[in-house]
Amino acid sequence: MFTKSAAFYDALYSWKDYPAEVEKIRSIIASRAPGAETLLDVACGTGLHLSLLRDSFRIEGVDLDPGLMEIARERLPDVPFHLGDMRTFNLGRQFDVVTCLFSSIGYMTTIEDVLHALANMAGHLAPDGVMLVEPWMSPDGFDPNHKPRPLIAEGDGFTVVRMNDSSVDRRLSTMRFHYLVGRPGKVDHFTEDHVLGLFTVDEMAAAFAAAGLIAELDPEGLMGRGLWIARHSRPSSPTS
């Protein structure tokens, strides 16, 4: 995933309006789980959402990428972070809110993997809690023929330029990111392939239901990709 580019992640995504996204997250939680005190962010990345939620909740994070997690731990040294796969991590306790944002669920490349991830997150969700999952694109919403546009960002001692080309193979979308990283005296180039599954709204809804959740889709969501808002369809027992 972001194995090569973790150091440039925050610079590249500085265009994201994290404060506005977190304000909407808070609003949803206040209306769906007003007594919520604890929050787990699955696929937490570098911890930017969590850094803005820490004043409202006792927070923890899970991510599969060691490089991103290292940055999150540096940003929030007093926050528990756990290295793990969203399908299989087990913290042995439940949270009032579970989030999985910025289309991270898309890295599940089969609907079976989506179900395993949702079921595992549901096992970490308190009986009266709320789960927020930001989806990736549907099969008819991903355009592999878009015109590549450069994303240019500045950081501490570097300038990074990223472009990508895209392809679709059945239900898999692949984005090959090309990076040019300029530092004093040199320019490096590398690529990363990001493969994400393409699933319909009906397929996602069925996966939530199979995981024991009642889910509704806010079509706009946090940044135009939609947002699934889910609750337990029946009481759940703590993960063991």
Describe each PLM feature range.
Residues 96-112:
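A short SAM/SAH-binding and catalytic strip from SAM-dependent methyltransferases
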Residues 1-43:
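Conserved class I S-adenosyl-L-methionine
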Residues 47-88:
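Class I SAM-dependent methyltransferase SAM/SAH-binding core
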Residues 87-97:
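A short acidic, Gly/Pro-enriched loop at the edge of an enzyme's catalytic core
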Residues 197, 201-240:
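C-terminal lobe and adjacent flexible extensions of AdoMet/dcAdoMet transferase-like proteins
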Residues 132-205:
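SAM-dependent methyltransferase
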Residues 115-127:
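A short glycine-rich, Lys/Arg-flanked "PGG" loop and its adjoining helix->strand segment in the class I
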